[in-house]
Amino acid sequence: VAAYATAVEVNGGHPDTYVVRKGDTLWDIAGKFLQKPWLWPEIWQANPQIANPHLIYPGDVLSLAYLDRVTAKPGPRQEAPVTGVPLAQVEPFLKQLSVVDSIEGLPYVVGLEDNRLRATGGQTAYVRLADAQPGQRWAVVRPTVRYAQPKPTEDLTANGDVTPGSGNLWKAFNAPNHRRGVLGYELAQVGLGTITQVAGEKTEASTLVLDSNANGREVRAGDRLVPVEAQPYDLQFFPHVPAASVEGVDVRVLAVTDMFDAGGPRDVIAISAGKAQGVDNGTVFSLWRQGSHVAHRMKYPTSSRMDDSRSTGAGRVTLPDEYAAHAMVFRTFDNVSYALVMQGVKPVKVGYSALHPDAK
């Protein structure tokens, strides 16, 4: 069983007080006081005398008080609370994408107005939808990536099951096969619509009128439907270490968003663990390239002659794991989560391991 030190290491140059500014994130704030931002819950002392004591707002004055505890003196609190990660850098992954365990049984588009091949805002889609009601709001989505657990110790290339041009935001992701179980199906939103007429005796399809679509995507037959969520995400969370239930789970990077096949700070990644494994928003992982197993090719010479040293091909050597970065989860699904790379020393690639943030 792995054990990690939990002693809180306060930054030597930390401020005695800090006035929270608009644009700060909880990771930024924690880093001003701590060498390890994921230990913020260890020093944060919520004020029980104020509403929503765990939220921090621009204008609040944070102080490192007695026994290395951070307390907050509320400011005017006229703006939105500070978020865990910058909204602008993760917004497409909050509003456009979701992951489901299966796409079987989802309602779907069977046809379009005037027998079109594509439909956009203001036009009509005909959908197979049980128990449809006029006025219901639905998101039209398209399956893009099918996630599966990567092979161990493998740097994977940008292959995978994807519908080209369908809203997939990843530049590299793991390609599943029949030997590795599917973790989930990613759905990209292509439009929104409202049910105006339901199926009846003379028709088997309900009518969905599409909203004006600012993203320019077009709906087509075969697209699926999911309910519109009133609040699909929450960005008010603290960085923290993984729950005990995550220990021992083989968590790996499934996808990266950088322009090539690797991601650096402020790039989004997908990892192979979610709510079912105890991962929640704010969970921090360290990301590692597993040490390669290389052939031990050199034979030590039995004499001083250099040409006696030859490649033997015998034996293999395991190289050390290599640290790449830290990432913080900002959205979770059953078996997949999205995380933002917060800091690192080298690019993150698909297949890298996600470990406890204090792993060495």
Where are these regions (language model features)?
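Surface-exposed, polar/charged interaction patches used for macromolecular assembly or partner binding
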Residues: 1-360
